[in-house]
Amino acid sequence: GWFYGFKLHAIINHKGELVSVKVTAGNTDDRVPVKDMATSLFGKLFGDRGYISKALNEWLTKHSDTTLITKLRCHMKPQLLEPMDEALLNHRSLVETVFGELKNLCQIEHSRHRSVTGFITNLLSGLIAYCWFPYKPTIKNMHQQGQVATL
């Protein structure tokens, strides 16, 4: 059999709800699908170091009124963040928790699909099941105005 790697890219809000989802090939750079996924967003977008890109940040600011906030790499100049942004950046574990629930509870990480249709059916049914969960992981005591999304 053949194995075709894929990546699931997701943007979630502070309530753990899926805002945008995209599937790409496994060898796709993480920054590539962000432009498609974030066009209708506004506010602040929190991501890990894999999303650091001056060009992406400028594009998001210009086309979607979104600010990308990431942790810095080792040899980057420190940047001053607002205290709320710093606190929210420390809650990136919310994304890992959501992906953990998608993989373990919704069983989207299944490697023996017999067809592309079976793969897509399994993925979509897992995403739909997650959307119907009554209790999703959230950031507690969220008092910030506006929408917060996390990559």
What are these regions (language model features)?
Residues 30, 91, 120, 124:
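Hydrophobic (often cysteine-bearing) scaffold residues that line and stabilize catalytic clefts
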Residues 44, 49-117:
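Helix-centered, glycine/charged polyanion-binding patches within enzymatic domains
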Residues 45-46, 60-67, 115, 120, ...:
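Anion-binding and metal-coordination hotspots
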Residues 1-64, 69-74, 127:
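Polybasic low-complexity intrinsically disordered regions
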